[in-house]
Curated annotation (Swiss-Prot):
Its EC number is 2.8.4.3. This is tRNA-2-methylthio-N(6)-dimethylallyladenosine synthase. It comes from Oceanobacillus iheyensis (strain DSM 14371 / CIP 107618 / JCM 11309 / KCTC 3954 / HTE831). The lineage of its organism: Bacteria, Bacillati, Bacillota, Bacilli, Bacillales. Monomer. The gene is miaB. One of its GO terms (molecular function) is metal ion binding. [4Fe-4S] cluster 1 binds at C85, C121, C155.
Length: 519
């Protein structure tokens, strides 16, 4: 028997021991053992979540890697696979920063990794299926290398049913943690390295705000800046309030300091992040300060581009519109999820606005910023959506003139009110509606792109095109993808490009000589 076979047999014996242990332990006992005391062993409960109290959020500025963990990753590598939204991408940057400070190096090669983390998304069933598929694919790698640490984190980890499934069926997973305790990663890795059982630490109570977490950002061109956490809107289809917790805002001074630091490092663009970004500041009790005020302060900082996402129409107030209308580094590309064009469906979704109120908000934005680009999110096939209600969505898309949209078939999420609704819309009808909606969105996108033919646009160059390394790619102020040929030295800079060809979702052009705007 060679060394590899011995390792595999040892791993199999360990897994069998875990299986036997789990068989002799009830799911409730397992969950009670691994989850914090605040966690009640049950599926996400929106009624209980609504009753949560607004406790004082503590701010911490003293994060550091424990001395005994500072070099534990020396000579080892990590890989983080990220699923879902920009918030998850930002969380991945934080985890990568922590692991880097522990001595680990990043890799994109699965077989090279000593730690693999799956940063998961729970917003749709399809995203969860991808994660469980990946968990299965990693099992042979774990058998081959028993010292490999495999962890599952992110929003799926906040679901009791997901953790229970992993405990029962995927004993090759070493580590599970949630969205509220990322700062405890060094301690969790240590436990996984030296412990003999699967390490599970999921907090149901929202975490405090940890301000000085390290971040390993990709490049020095664009940066995510998280300004708040959580969501209190409780849309009936959405699990985010359960997986991300109540709304908690960072202090303005900490955000502004982070943006200034990014400017000093040479970043050209920041995107302010939040599950419901324009609810920023509503939880402050000592100051009256919202997203409009924050944007106004960042407007004064010498950074070329500032964006924000994702906003909720209900919180998009006149102050924010007034500030955005100043222009300058505040870009007039606004992502404003509508979800449906039917007031009846919007009410069932608990969006707290009507079709007419949404259109009035769009009118206000257009008056203040006539050239603003609007994009959106839309769900089709919400339980019992009629053909007439779907047509209302189609006419709203045309009336607003969205230049892009993220479109989805409704995906029921366990524990949400909408998931309990009886649905009489056939799956084939939902697919047809999605197809028709996408056809309309594609048509409107193509029409908006044609307006750029022959014009010159400012492009923040992000790197080589994914399709051709001889071509550079970047984005305009209105978030349009532009491909063009130019010197590699222009990467990370804002250049002027003349558009020579328009496509449905991208533009081609030629770089105008001597137009580098930012060094």
């Amino acid at each position: 028997m060679n060394e590899q076979q011995r390792k595999q047999q040892s791993q199999i014996r360990t897994e069998q021991a875990n299986v036997d242990r789990i068989k002799n332990t009830s799911s409730e006992d397992m969950i009670a053992k691994y989850f914090q005391q605040e966690y009640e062993p049950q599926s996400p409960d929106i009624k209980q979540a609504r009753k949560r109290k607004r406790e004082d959020v503590q701010f911490h500025y003293d994060f550091s890697i424990p001395e005994d963990m500072e070099k534990i990753g020396h000579g080892k590598k990590f890989l983080i696979r990220t699923y879902g939204c920009q918030m998850n991408e930002h969380d991945t940057e934080v985890m990568a920063g922590i692991l880097s400070e522990m001595g680990y190096e990043s890799t994109t090669v699965t077989e090279e990794a000593d730690i693999i983390l799956l940063n998961t998304c729970a917003i749709r069933e399809n995203a969860e299926n991808k994660v469980f598929g990946e968990i299965g694919h990693l099992k042979p790698l774990k058998l081959e290398n028993p010292d490999l640490i495999i962890g599952v984190c992110g929003c799926m980890s906040q679901e009791e049913s997901v953790v229970d499934r992993i405990l029962q069926k995927h004993q090759h997973i070493d580590l599970i943690f949630g969205t509220h305790n990322i700062h405890r990663l060094p301690h969790l890795v240590k436990e996984a390295l030296f412990g003999k059982e699967m390490i599970v630490e999921v907090w149901s109570k929202e975490g405090d705000i940890i301000e000085n977490l390290p971040k390993a950002r990709k490049g020095k061109i664009k940066a995510w800046v998280n300004i708040m956490y959580g969501c209190d809107k409780f849309c009936t289809y959405c699990i985010v309030p359960m997986t991300r917790g109540k709304e908690r805002s960072r202090r303005p001074k900490d955000i502004i300091q982070e943006v200034r630091h990014l400017v000093a490092q040479g970043y050209q663009e920041v995107t302010l992040l939040g599950q419901n970004v324009n609810a920023y500041g509503k939880d402050f009790e000592d100051i009256e300060y919202g997203l409009g005020d924050l944007m106004n302060d960042i407007h004064k900082i010498d950074i070329p581009r500032v964006r924000f996402t994702t906003s909720h129409p209900r919180d998009f107030d006149d102050r924010l519109i007034e500030v955005l209308a100043q222009g300058g580094n505040l870009l007039d590309h606004i992502h404003l999820p509508v979800q449906s064009g039917s007031s009846e469906i919007l009410k069932k979704m608990n969006r707290k606005y009507t079709r007419e109120e949404y259109l009035e908000l769009v009118r206000k934005i257009r008056i203040a910023m006539p050239n603003a680009t609007l994009t959106t999110d839309i769900i089709v096939g919400f339980p019992n959506e009629t053909e007439e209600q779907f047509e209302e969505t189609m006419t709203l898309v045309e009336e607003v003139g969205f230049e892009a949209a993220y479109t989805f078939i409704y995906s029921p999420r366990e524990g949400t009110p909408a998931a309990r609704k009886k649905d009489d819309v056939p799956e084939e009808v939902k697919k047809q509606r999605l197809y028709r909606l996408n056809e309309l969105v594609n048509k409107q996108s193509a029409a908006s792109m044609k307006d750029y033919a022959g014009k010159k646009v400012k492009v923040l160059v992000e790197g080589e095109s994914k399709k051709d390394p001889e071509v550079l790619a970047g984005y305009t102020e209105k978030n349009k993808l532009v491909n063009f040929k130019g010197p590699k030295s222009s990467i990370g800079k804002i250049v002027e490009v003349e558009i020579t060809e328009t496509k449905t979702w991208s533009l081609n052009g030629v770089m105008v000589e001597n137009t580098v705007e930012v060094n």
